[in-house]
Amino acid sequence: SPISRAGGFIFDKDIYDKIGADKTPYEYVRDNEWTLDTLARTAKLGYKDLNGNAQIDKEDQFGIGSSWKEIYARYINGSGISLISQDENGYPVFDLPDNQTAIDKMLRIFDLFNDKEIYNNPSKSDAEVLANGEIAKHNVLYVLGHPNGMGTKYRQLDNVNVGFVPCPKYD
């Protein structure tokens, strides 16, 4: 159902408490400040060189660890980007090439994926991130998920102090 598959971010509260953010994710949501930039800023604070080799690698702690295609689709939807509209006869029209606002938003989202302190995920899917136990090992601050999976599908979360927030809006 749409409610059971509502997407958002599972976050490790213990990591979050250590990053020095101004507010909790819940406070950002409550204050209508849970935006893509807020997520990126707090995710960047979540990066930590765990193995001390001064290189960004898979042994480090990252801000966001999820499938880029799954997370990108949620960012696009949450940003109000429309790729298709209707013409005067009601037929679908691909109108992205003429929508500079949508292009600018998509480029901003792409920029987030290029900052390896914010996002660096060697896994191919959210299921892999969870199956590999990255959040259970406290190696990632945020991972995509949905509420119904927190009590059933993501069993490794049983011993992790996690929270859940919706996907952020664009601005």
Show which residues each predicted segment covers.
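Second-shell loop/turn segments in exported
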Residues: 25-30, 93-97
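Glycine-centered hinge/linker elements that transmit conformational signals in sensory
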Residues: 36, 40-45, 73-126
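Acidic, glycine-anchored loop motifs typical of Ca2+
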Residues: 27, 49-60
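Short helices/loops that flank or line small-molecule/ion binding pockets
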Residues: 38-45, 128-143
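Extracellular/periplasmic catalytic domains that process cell-envelope and extracellular macromolecules
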Residues: 1-4, 10, 55-58, 134-137, ...
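Extracytoplasmic/periplasmic substrate-recognition and gating elements
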Residues: 154-171
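Periplasmic solute-binding protein
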Residues: 1-27, 66-90
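Beta->alpha turn/N-cap motifs
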Residues: 68, 145-150
